[in-house]
Amino acid sequence: MNGQNIRIRLKAFDHRILDTSTKEIVSTAKRTGAHVRGPIPLPTKIEKFTVNRSPHVDKKSREQFEIRTHKRVLDIVDPTPQTVDALMKLDLAAGVDVEIKL
């Protein structure tokens, strides 16, 4: 697979799970002989939701909630067939969303 790159985008709400997953991917790729660029942290997406505290009155009394989506990008340069097989067999944490582009 010469001249080809694999780009892996990881998303998670918890940054600790995300970091452990990126470390697993990097160690697996390096063990099989591929060159890894990253992990590159992307900007955290913060979604804020504002709701009324009471169900009926008191419009001025509100509460805010937020969801933070943390993202990382990894580039695997010139992956070997063993690298692709190892990445397919890799079992990551449940809260991590993985997008792979060849």
UniProtKB/Swiss-Prot annotation:
GO terms for molecular function: structural constituent of ribosome; tRNA binding. It comes from the Bacteria. GO terms for biological process: translation. Pfam families: Ribosomal_S10. Keywords: Ribonucleoprotein, Ribosomal protein. Coiled coil: none annotated. GO terms for cellular component: ribonucleoprotein complex; ribosome. NCBIfam families: PRK00596.1, rpsJ_bact. This is Small ribosomal subunit protein uS10. The gene is rpsJ.
